[in-house]
């Protein structure tokens, strides 16, 4: 099976065999790319696999960028002769998940992550933190009801905003920085973004725990979740592939596997 997770910043492809993600490829999200270009990227990934009999028989897509969804559907139908499964809010009902929010529209990536979390951690009150372009804190009851949320900028937006709104500050990447105080401009900005993001997430988690006043099983996913590998004192479960795992679980439910 081919898994395609289309985000605002990156597109992540995954090859799944026997419910296991065996290969992934991440590229930047660029709406003007064609189905032919995506097929080239996929061939590069497939050529790295040490298997001669692998055939894509199913494709499932999560997308928050409609302009990229269209060429991905074309990729699926033209090159693989497959009508892909496109995740939408109706799939919440299939997975026995209730969206108990005033705004019922939920991003497909969020839904996939939540499907993954409630499947891996059943009968638990959950706080699922999706760390992508935006950072989304999802509260899910042990009865599988999505009842609360907090949405903040992601680390990438924080770094990008610094560059866009200042004339002289250098461009930086959001990477792990061992200490917060530096005597050079570049590292001072990197440390500010990294430790500022860590402090923001930790502070919001603490406030959520205070307001909820109950045990929450906390899971972090998304590209920026790896920034918290050394901060497991308040986020013990870090799973960058949780969204893709949720897509696999949904596929299995839809096709009775």
UniProtKB/Swiss-Prot annotation:
The catalytic activity of this protein is classed by the Enzyme Commission as 2.7.1.33
- Coiled-coil-forming residues are none
The note on the cofactor says: A monovalent cation. Ammonium or potassium.
BP GO terms, sorted: coenzyme A biosynthetic process
Asked whether the keyword Cytoplasm is assigned, the reply is yes
Instruction: Give the InterPro entries listed for this entry.
Output: ATPase_NBD (IPR043129), Type_III_PanK (IPR004619)
Q: Which GO terms describe its molecular function?
A: ATP binding; pantothenate kinase activity
| Catalytic activity annotation | (R)-pantothenate + ATP = (R)-4'-phosphopantothenate + ADP + H(+)
Q: Where does substrate bind?
A: 107-110
**Would you name any one GO CC term?**
cytoplasm
Protein family per UniProt: Belongs to the type III pantothenate kinase family.
Name under which the protein is recorded = Type III pantothenate kinase
Classification from the root reads:
Bacteria, Pseudomonadati, Pseudomonadota, Alphaproteobacteria, Rickettsiales
């Amino acid at each position: 099976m081919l898994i395609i997770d289309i985000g605002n910043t990156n597109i992540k492809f995954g090859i799944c065999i026997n419910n296991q993600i065996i290969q992934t490829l991440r590229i930047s999200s660029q709406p003007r790319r064609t189905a032919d270009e995506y097929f080239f990227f996929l061939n590069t990934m497939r050529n790295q696999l040490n298997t001669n009999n692998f055939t894509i028989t199913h494709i499932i897509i999560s997308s928050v960028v409609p302009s990229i969804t269209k060429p991905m559907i074309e990729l699926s139908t033209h090159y693989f002769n497959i009508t892909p499964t496109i995740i939408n809010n109706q799939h919440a009902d299939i997975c026995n998940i209730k969206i108990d929010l005033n705004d019922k529209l939920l991003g497909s990536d969020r839904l996939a992550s939540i499907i993954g979390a409630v499947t891996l951690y059943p009968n638990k009150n959950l706080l699922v933190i999706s760390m992508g372009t935006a950072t989304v804190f999802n509260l899910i009851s042990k009865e599988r009801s999505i009842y609360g949320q907090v949405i903040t900028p992601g680390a990438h937006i924080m770094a990008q905003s610094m560059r866009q709104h200042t004339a002289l500050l250098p461009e930086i990447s959001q990477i792990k920085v061992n200490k917060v105080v530096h005597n050079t401009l570049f590292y001072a900005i990197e440390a500010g973004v990294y430790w500022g993001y860590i402090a923001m997430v930790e502070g919001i988690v603490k406030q959520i725990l205070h307001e909820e006043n109950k045990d929450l099983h906390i899971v972090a996913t998304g590209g920026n979740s790896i920034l918290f590998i050394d901060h497991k004192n308040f986020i013990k479960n870090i799973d960058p592939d949780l969204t893709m795992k949720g897509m696999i679980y949904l596929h299995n439910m839809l096709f009775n596997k």
